[in-house]
Amino acid sequence: MSSALAISMLVKDYGRHAALRDVDLTIEDGELVGLLGPNGAGKSTLVKIVCGLVRPTGGRVTIHGHPAGSVAARRLIGYLPELFRYPDWCTADEVMRLHQRLAESTGDERERHELLELVGLADARDKRVEAMSKGMQQRLGLGQALIGAPRLLLLDEPTSALDPAGRIAVRELLEELRRRGTAVLLNSHLLSEVERVVDRVTIINRGVTVATGTPAELSRPGGVDVTTQDGVRHFPDAAREDIPGIVADLVAAGERVYDVSLVTSSLEEVYLQAVSDGAAS
């Protein structure tokens, strides 16, 4: 059984500039992968290649076994770009109907209404785009990306214009898509949001993969914090197996131990370190 997305040794050159160099990435059905990197890292180029909008210089990209850019592959993809624009005079329902026709979807009015309800626009289907907030337009973008029940969903900054309640709603939507078996590639600068929802993360910098794995795998141990009557004491070189000895030594020294916790780095810290290491190499 082929992966939802399989990228192998992907290379993209623009003249003498290497936008991507030997990038590998796979996403399985029902898996949500975060794509992280600074501006100019190559993220947008990678997504455009997956969509078939840009041809790679080398390597292989397939969507459920179909070469990227083929008609069969494009029919399996839903895409929400970071920058999008819908006609101001169109209503939400008209935008959805237009994209159904562009996608040659077999969906009907029922599909449109179900998707608008799914993204929280059930009561705004007759509202014109010009009267929508940026957050509502972003929800509409999510709705159009889901037309035709895509098996691979590419989301570029899907929560950037949403308030906290809207971001929670998107997280719940992503969980529902995961249950349905939809594969998702999520590009976002909101690392706290990414950390909450993804199964794996790939970090690229200057066109090269600098880190990949689950958030737990990428988190580096940062020692042990012990709370005593005198406050929190940090043991930077300690690991889990060192905790009993640390506690025993403190108790023997007459200290009262109230709490012990392992310290690990956040995804933001891992990201900053990976990008810094990649820039220095």
Enumerate the language-model features and the residues they cover:
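Short, surface-exposed loop and linker segments with low hydrophobicity and enrichment for Pro/Ser/Thr
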Residues: 1, 88-90, 135, 182, ...
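ABC-family P-loop ATPase nucleotide-binding domain
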Residues: 1-11, 277-281
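Serine/threonine-rich low-complexity intrinsically disordered regions
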Residues: 3-6, 70, 108, 185, ...
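ABC transporter nucleotide-binding domains
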Residues: 5, 12-186, 191-192, 196-205, ...
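Short, charged/small-residue-rich alpha-helical element at the C-terminal edge
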Residues: 215-281
